[in-house]
């Protein structure tokens, strides 16, 4: 009995121990599961945090905000790879672009005259004219019409219908909704493109957290703009510009894109030889009789430009001292005559008058008609325009005058050349690029680096100044149309120290930077050399300006002169050769030494 009881008690204790062990195991397992659960929760929370912080955003960008379109009638304007700040409009189902954007970014040939309320476009042989708020227009005097209003005025802004623009420019355009936008392309030739390897997303900025601009499908072509780290900036066909991961795109390749549109062809009267032009300053009819003796010592001269025409008034009337005998003499010497017309010295003579003249369509027409009458009457070969009073606000009126004059010159087979200052920021309103499209020659007056009103002495035409003018001009105009003009003159400078009183009076002004009072006079080549010889001054070659230089003291003044001679002119002619220009011009006949002509002739053959 006792043994059985002991066995029972023993088994009971053993079972209790087993139960305890099982309970402890269950407790440990539960505790382990709880720990594992908390670990999983922590990892999940951390993962979510990391994903939110570093994972790609799925937020769709607001395209209205992206394009800056904040009104239902507004339309974004995309030109090639640029979204313009200016906005177009949609009216009666037609897309319209702001005039300034059209002129600056798409086609500078459009000309809007706000005072007259007309839009013009000069074709090679005819003029298109459109009144505002009209479906009708004239082309070569013939009335035509569209089924939409061509030009709209809203507030102080003028808009042109996209469909009308496409009739003239070498540009394509596609329009889209949601949001309204116009995508224009005129960057013909070689462009860089790439293709999506897989479905991917375009983002606003180069980063996965940036908002999504567009879904890009596998095989979609995009236009490559630039690389930014692991991203590529690209443009879609429908004008969205953003970033795609480089790994989602194939290698960039170069394609050639050609235009299917037909832009107007402005034929040119450029010659098959280098131009060697000299301006002949003629101030009265009697001076015309000096031509034979004036050109007697020249060599290789191809063209002469007498200063015959001045604009008499702001209505477009002309003062003329043209001569048939002069033209006959020039033609007998195998010279073409390109008669010069100017807006100074002898008629109108201020920026205000030039503006009044050129901003009037009637005055421009009157002036052009008067010029062509003279050309026909005297058998003149071409017109040389020398307008030096064109203000910035007059710039677009000036270039429209050149375009309209080019129509008549083209119709009558007469050469049109335009004189220009050395291109700089402050005279960019002369619009060399537009001149180069319609004029036969664009002449750069490569002198007056230092002029009569300069506050310091200096060269009239140092080599760097001349080359900069040529370099800038040939960026905008075909080299064969560019003529560089050289000076047959120089300036003798006189410097006298400013007094203390003068310096005090000029304190705080730009003029105060210059410690000398300077005056100068223009001298021809022979006169300049005689002046140096009379002073007994030594002449040294100045490598920086590529000119011979002399300096001397006399009666408390310092005299300085940078000579123009065979050496300096040849240095400038080498630039003509280097840039393969259309020729050389010179101001003015009678200022040169005879041996200059053999130097010039060497470079124009």
Each predicted region: which residue ranges?
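SH3/SH3-like beta-barrel fold
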Residues: 121, 219, 231-236, 244
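Substrate-binding surface in catalytic domains of secreted glycosidases
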Residues: 314-321, 369, 392-530
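Hydrophobic faces of well-ordered beta-strands that scaffold small-molecule active sites
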Residues: 276-280, 302-306, 337-341, 383-385, ...
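Glycan-binding loop/region signatures in secreted carbohydrate-active enzymes
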Residues: 259-261, 346-347, 353, 490-572, ...
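Boundary/entry segment of secreted carbohydrate-active catalytic domains
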Residues: 199-201, 240, 245-294
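Catalytic domains of carbohydrate-active enzymes, especially glycoside hydrolases
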Residues: 287-312, 370-383, 572-583
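Primary recognition of N-terminal secretory signal peptides and signal-anchoring hydrophobic helices
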Residues: 13-228, 258-270
